[in-house]
């Protein structure tokens, strides 16, 4: 899959090849240059863990292949039972590729497993002394390969830039999807819309109480109108906050980003700059103020901020 001596070249080639493929597919129509700058320019020959890092990406590719095979088995089973055409299949990831480094991890810590299902100890190669591959080794891609995996975007999981929060979704439902079949849509959605979609499809209603207590209304909105007509009245804004990383996206394509508590808001026009290469905050301060005010209102309403122990911004 990958030769360690050539992996730095491969990183550039793979990233560029993915970018060219995205252009061919018309994923970002009307944009001619949406590949963000590489975030790392160090040389592969200076990497003391070159062989380990190359193997980690090879294992990652193999895992994706196994996922693909598993999905194929599900689809074949649905075909055999005659249920495929009337089954809604949604496929997406939960965030961008992770930059986490297993050198900083310990088995049994947080959600990290310390043994396999049959009781074998899992090795966390803090010095990358054991190559990735077997189920008894824990591996990760790290930031450099994540920058490749998240092409064309900047950054990765846990960040509020597109490389962290943009998760394209595939929907398959022959009997239900009536518009733009086999195509793409630029309609904006959120993972919380999935539950709203399921409730809509089931012709059910979201409850207003639980055991005599009022509960908060559902934030998500059904994706069904997009499947049937190609459009819907979606969210006016979508807000994000994770480890003090903040983002706020408007339905007209503007996006605020604040990567730290003490950072200034950054402003991007995703209609023209999908990979967030040009900060327009200084050019459009009124837009920043408008969206920042809306973010504060959203954060308060959804009880995102302030949270216990939160430091002043």
Give a label for each model feature.
Residues 13-17, 21, 55, 59-62, ...:
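Extracytoplasmic/secreted proteins, especially bacterial periplasmic and envelope-associated proteins
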Residues 134-165, 172, 176-187, 192-270, ...:
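C-terminal cap/loop subdomain of S1 sulfatases and analogous C-terminal strand-loop tails that border
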Residues 34-55, 194, 251-252, 256, ...:
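Long, internal low-complexity/basic segments
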Residues 96-104, 229-235:
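Secretory-pathway/luminal and periplasmic proteins that interact with or process carbohydrate-rich
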Residues 4, 33-34, 75, 87, ...:
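Short, solvent-exposed loop/turn and secondary-structure capping segments
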Residues 64, 71-74, 78, 87-94, ...:
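Beta-strand elements within well-structured catalytic alpha/beta cores of enzymes
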Residues 12-21, 29, 50-87, 97, ...:
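A long, amphipathic alpha-helix that forms part
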Residues 1-6, 10:
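Single conserved hydrophobic/aromatic residue that forms the stacking wall/gate
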């Amino acid at each position: 899959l990958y030769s360690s001596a050539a992996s730095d070249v491969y990183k550039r080639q793979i990233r560029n090849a993915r970018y060219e493929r995205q252009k061919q597919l018309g994923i970002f129509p009307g944009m001619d240059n949406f590949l963000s700058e590489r975030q790392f320019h160090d040389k592969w020959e200076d990497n003391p863990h070159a062989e380990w890092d190359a193997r980690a990406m090879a294992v990652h590719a193999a895992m994706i292949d196994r996922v693909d095979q598993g999905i194929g088995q599900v689809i074949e089973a649905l075909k055999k039972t005659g249920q495929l055409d009337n089954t809604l299949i949604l496929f997406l990831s939960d965030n961008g590729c992770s930059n986490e480094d297993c050198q900083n991890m310990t088995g049994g810590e947080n959600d990290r497993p310390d043994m396999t299902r049959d009781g074998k100890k899992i090795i966390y190669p803090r010095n990358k002394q054991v190559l990735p591959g077997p189920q008894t080794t824990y591996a990760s891609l790290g930031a450099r390969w994540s920058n490749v995996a998240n092409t064309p975007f900047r950054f990765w999981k846990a960040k509020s830039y597109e490389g962290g929060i943009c998760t394209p979704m595939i929907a398959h439902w022959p009997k239900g999807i009536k518009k733009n079949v086999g195509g793409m849509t630029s309609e904006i959605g959120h993972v919380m819309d999935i539950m709203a979609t399921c409730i809509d499809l089931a012709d059910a209603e979201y409850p207003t109480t639980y055991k005599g207590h009022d509960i908060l209304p559902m934030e998500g909105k059904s994706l069904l109108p997009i499947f049937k007509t190609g459009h819907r009245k979606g969210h006016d804004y979508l807000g994000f906050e994770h480890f003090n990383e903040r983002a706020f996206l408007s339905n007209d394509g503007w996006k605020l980003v604040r990567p730290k508590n003490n950072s200034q808001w950054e402003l991007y026009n995703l209609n023209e700059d999908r990979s967030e290469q040009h900060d327009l905050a200084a050019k459009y301060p009124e837009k920043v103020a408008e969206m920042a005010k809306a973010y504060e209102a959203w954060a308060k309403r959804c009880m995102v901020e302030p949270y216990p122990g939160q430091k002043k911004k």
